[in-house]
Every structure is written in C-alpha cells, then in structure tokens.
Swiss-Prot record:
Pfam families: Ribosomal_L21p
Gene: rplU
Family, similarity comment: Belongs to the bacterial ribosomal protein bL21 family.
GO MF term set: rRNA binding; structural constituent of ribosome
UniProtKB keywords: Ribonucleoprotein, Ribosomal protein, RNA-binding, rRNA-binding
Organism of origin: Mesomycoplasma hyopneumoniae (strain 232) (Mycoplasma hyopneumoniae)
Domain of life of the organism encoding this protein: Bacteria
Function field: This protein binds to 23S rRNA in the presence of protein L20.
GO biological process, one term: translation
One term under GO cellular component: ribosome
Protein name: Large ribosomal subunit protein bL21
Subunit and partners: Part of the 50S ribosomal subunit. Contacts protein L20.
Amino acid sequence: MFAIIKTSGRQLKVEKDQTIFVEKIDKNEGETITFTDILFINGKIGTPYVENASVTGIIEKQGKAKKIVVYRHNPKSTHKRKLGHRQLFTKVKITELKG
C-alpha cells in the first residue's frame, strides 16, 4: 500500500516504514507529524485531496544538506561572485497510512 502526499510544493510517493527527506518543518526531533494533503491512497484519487485520509510520521533528524557552490562570472569584465548554499531538510520516517 502506498500514498502520494503533497508537502513543500512537491509530490512524494510514500510507503509504511519508508524514510523521506522534505524541506525543513518547524518541529523537534522525535515529534509526530501528520500530512493531510493526500492526493492518492488505496486506489482513491482525490479531487484535489482525499477526504479523511492522513499519513503519519516521526521526525528523525533536522539537518543541512551538502554545500553547493554557485559561481557567477561575467566574461566581459573582472566581476566574479562565488556563493555557497546549504539547504535545510527534515528526515521523516513514515509510520502509518490512513484512508
């Protein structure tokens, strides 16, 4: 059994006991989170969401992804710009699919 949830502007296919990485959610590690924007579960397709359906998970970790380097250079001048970015993420383990 699987479900398709919508979180942080993305759609994710999830199953029970699966670990997913989503954009940062303001909760502490060990807390329970419930996703209510369910697009598909048990063969039911939502319009746009399935009613009375939810996916529950436990937050395992809050962290930062690896650094990416953004480098911009204008070849007609000596202008250069180098920036780094580390995206915040939340690691969630799916514990229950209801619906």
